[in-house]
């Protein structure tokens, strides 16, 4: 059994209403009792405007303390940046985590490796923990560039932060071609890339950091495939999109931690 604690994150993206978010939050909280929380860390990525509501609901739920809240993005500076949310604002609102570098931020909003790395640095310096997303597009995979792309993304982050800062990072490997498409990397494909990530970290950071850093898999994770993925040695959890909007499906994915014991 790995010493790395299994971690399952739900990324709610730009979804929900006040009513649906309340139902979902209560459902997730009910799924994670104290015993399960010892085995798996559960994080929910919440749209900015619903974060206070989710925090309020969790505070009133018996198992609410077992669920950690994450923002889905953040900006590096305060000031004249209309529409942005600064990392310090998240800290001020007692949000412990932030998801950075998600493929949708990279693809739709054209965030570069260097911009993502700067966000990671500033977030950690502010006191946040980061889920840092990396992964290749379908064209890059077909061109056999997966390792090259992932290495460049890792290098940018590593160049921006200290070795000690890695303890505040969870990596999420998300093959872009598998996100929201219904396609999923096979367990062997996912393990192969996770193993490469750990090898890169061993060679470029340290063996200790490589062994301690948790690497989630993200990309159409669902109740049907989570158990087989969880069996793989270098898969330390999941970053879940669509299935995390259904409390019952998310519960099944959280419980895939049983494959690690």
Curated annotation (Swiss-Prot):
Sequence positions that bind D-glyceraldehyde 3-phosphate: 11, 13, 180, 239, 241
Pathway: Carbohydrate biosynthesis; gluconeogenesis; Carbohydrate degradation; glycolysis; D-glyceraldehyde 3-phosphate from glycerone phosphate: step 1/1
Protein EC: 5.3.1.1
Molecular function per GO: triose-phosphate isomerase activity
Keyword field: Gluconeogenesis, Glycolysis, Isomerase
Assigned GO CC terms: cytosol
Enzyme category, top tier: isomerase
Matches recorded under SUPFAM superfamilies: Triosephosphate isomerase (TIM)
Function, in words: Catalyzes the interconversion of glyceraldehyde 3-phosphate and dihydroxyacetone phosphate in the glycolytic and gluconeogenic pathways.
Protein name: Triosephosphate isomerase
Source organism per UniProt: Entamoeba histolytica (strain ATCC 30459 / HM-1:IMSS / ABRM)
Classification of source organism: Eukaryota, Amoebozoa, Evosea, Archamoebae, Mastigamoebida
């Amino acid at each position: 059994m790995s010493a790395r604690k299994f971690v399952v994150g739900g990324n709610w993206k730009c979804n929900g209403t006040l009513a649906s978010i309340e139902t979902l939050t209560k459902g997730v909280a009910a799924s994670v009792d104290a015993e399960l929380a010892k085995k798996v860390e559960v994080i929910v990525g919440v749209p900015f405007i619903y974060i206070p509501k989710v925090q309020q609901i969790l505070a009133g739920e018996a198992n609410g303390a077992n669920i950690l809240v994450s923002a889905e993005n953040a900006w590096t500076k305060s000031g004249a940046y209309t529409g942005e949310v600064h990392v310090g604002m998240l800290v001020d609102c007692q949000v412990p985590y932030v998801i950075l570098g998600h493929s949708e931020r990279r693809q739709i909003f054209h965030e570069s490796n260097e911009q993502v790395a700067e966000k990671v640095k500033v977030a950690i310096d502010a006191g946040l923990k980061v889920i840092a997303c990396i992964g290749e597009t379908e064209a890059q995979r077909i061109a056999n560039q997966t390792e090259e792309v992932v290495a460049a993304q890792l290098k940018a982050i590593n160049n921006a932060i200290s070795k000690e800062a890695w303890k505040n990072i969870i990596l999420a490997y998300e093959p872009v071609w598998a996100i929201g498409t219904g396609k999923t990397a096979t367990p062997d494909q996912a393990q192969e890339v996770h193993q490469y990530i750990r090898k890169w970290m061993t060679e470029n950071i340290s063996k200790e950091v490589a062994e301690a850093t948790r690497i989630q898999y993200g990309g159409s994770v669902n109740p049907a495939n989570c158990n087989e993925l969880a069996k793989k040695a270098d898969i330390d959890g999941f970053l879940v999109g669509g299935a995390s909007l259904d409390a019952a499906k998310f519960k099944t994915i959280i419980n895939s931690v049983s494959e690690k014991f």
